[in-house]
Regions:
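Folded, non-transmembrane soluble domains that reside on the lumenal/extracytoplasmic side of membranes
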Residues: 1-162
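Selective detector of the "anchor" transmembrane alpha-helix that sits immediately C-terminal
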Residues: 158-175
Length: 175
């Protein structure tokens, strides 16, 4: 299960379609995805709720628990107002830059503003897959929130890739 509709915003068919979309995208991008709807908890921001939910449910793929969670955080039962948050973890932080998350948010709000909650989730999921296909934005930096340290993200250089291919070829020829 990757759709957690605690606020009851989705119809059964919408949940089914979102689960199917998430399953396909998880297979395509190799990272976890989840959609959560919930009512605002006293003393818990949307970010805190989303991050705690992701960790608490053991979501994530690979050694870095990579993935993203889209939270629709309603003010309360029967309310039409609320907040949203897009959390990213592990390798997903490389794909979902602050700018990409801002763009996702603008698109999500366009659907949330007309109470199209499933449409908002679908749009966010499809855009995340599109960003995954586009790849990591060049010139990124790593920021460690605990230490405040910033370091450049280093990708594989052409000569490193060539050396890896050479080593793999030599190993295959020797086998």
């Amino acid at each position: 299960q990757r759709v957690f509709d605690q606020a009851g915003l989705f119809e059964d068919q919408e949940k089914k379609e979102l689960e199917e979309l998430i399953a396909r995208e998880r297979e395509n991008i190799g990272m976890d995805l989840a959609v959560v709807t919930a009512f605002r908890q006293e003393g818990s921001s949307a970010r805190e709720y989303a991050d705690d939910f992701y960790d608490g449910m053991g979501l994530g793929e690979g050694r870095e628990d990579s993935g993203a969670l889209y939270l629709i955080y309603m003010d309360g039962p029967g309310e039409i107002h609320g907040d949203y948050y897009i959390s990213n973890f592990g390798e997903m932080t490389r794909l979902l830059t602050d700018e990409r998350i801002r763009q996702l948010g603008e698109k999500a709000v366009s659907r949330l503003s007309v109470q199209d909650y499933a449409g908002s989730a679908r749009l966010v999921l499809e855009e995340i897959e599109r960003y995954a296909e586009a790849g990591i934005v060049s010139g990124q930096h790593n920021y460690d929130e605990e230490t405040g340290r910033v370091s450049p993200h280093r990708g594989i250089r052409w000569y490193e890739a060539l050396a890896a291919v050479g080593v793999a070829g030599a190993a295959a020829a020797g086998a």
